[in-house]
Design a protein with these regions (language model features):
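Mixed-charge, glycine-accented linear interaction segment located at domain edges/termini
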Residues: 156, 160-182
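Short amphipathic alpha-helices in soluble, non-transmembrane regions
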Residues: 104-111, 170-171
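Short acidic, gly/pro-rich beta-turn/loop elements at beta-sheet edges
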Residues: 65-67, 100-102, 163-167
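Soluble non-cytosolic domains of exported or imported proteins
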Residues: 3-7, 96-101
Length: 182
């Protein structure tokens, strides 16, 4: 990811909140939607009966022609720019009794477009969900002597990356000296 990583994270969080019809900064939202931990073995384990949604954004490992779709333009700055669309995957893991309903709701509502709706929230941050993601997978995960419900959802994304060509050339501060010979 580029320097806009926190902007991307905020946009994804807000889009997920919009899918579920929750205000982004409420206590209920903060306890329900969480970014995945980088070290899962050290992450806190919520109660088996609690609904929790973890998400993470990672680059796709396979070479996808869409990830190399580059267009050259100058965005009114008179500097050449390359606009690339990099392939990423949004992995959403839902736990708890309502995990399947949450996963289906996110999959269905992520593509709604309009003011304050998920697709527009993502588009403002340069994130474009690829239509028709696969259906969520319902799994059961062992937790002690009991089973915990889990639904996995993977959504392919394209993230816009703008590269502006800028070469610093030494500025001419005074005209060059001209020597005339007779």
């Amino acid at each position: 990811m580029t320097s806009n990583e926190s902007e991307f994270q905020l946009a994804i969080h807000n889009a997920l909140c919009s899918c579920l019809g929750l205000p982004p900064s409420s206590e209920q939202t903060l306890s329900l939607i969480r970014q995945a931990y980088t070290e899962p073995e050290n992450s806190p384990q919520p109660a088996r009966t609690a609904d929790v949604i973890y998400w993470s954004l990672s680059p796709e490992s396979a070479e996808d022609p869409a990830s190399y779709n580059e267009t050259v333009a100058s965005a009114g700055t008179h500097k050449p720019a390359v606009h690339r669309y990099l392939a990423y995957q949004l992995l959403i893991v839902c736990y708890g009794p309502g995990c399947e309903a949450y996963a289906h709701r996110i999959r269905s509502f992520l593509y709604l477009d309009g003011a304050g709706l998920p697709r527009q929230i993502l588009r403002k941050a340069g994130i474009y969900p690829v239509p028709d993601p696969p259906a969520p997978q319902l799994l059961y995960e062992p937790e002690g002597s009991l089973w915990r419900r889990r639904a996995d959802l993977t959504i392919p994304l394209r993230v816009r990356d703008d590269l502006v060509y800028s070469v610093s050339r030494g500025a001419i501060t005074s005209p060059p000296a001209v020597i005339l010979h007779r």
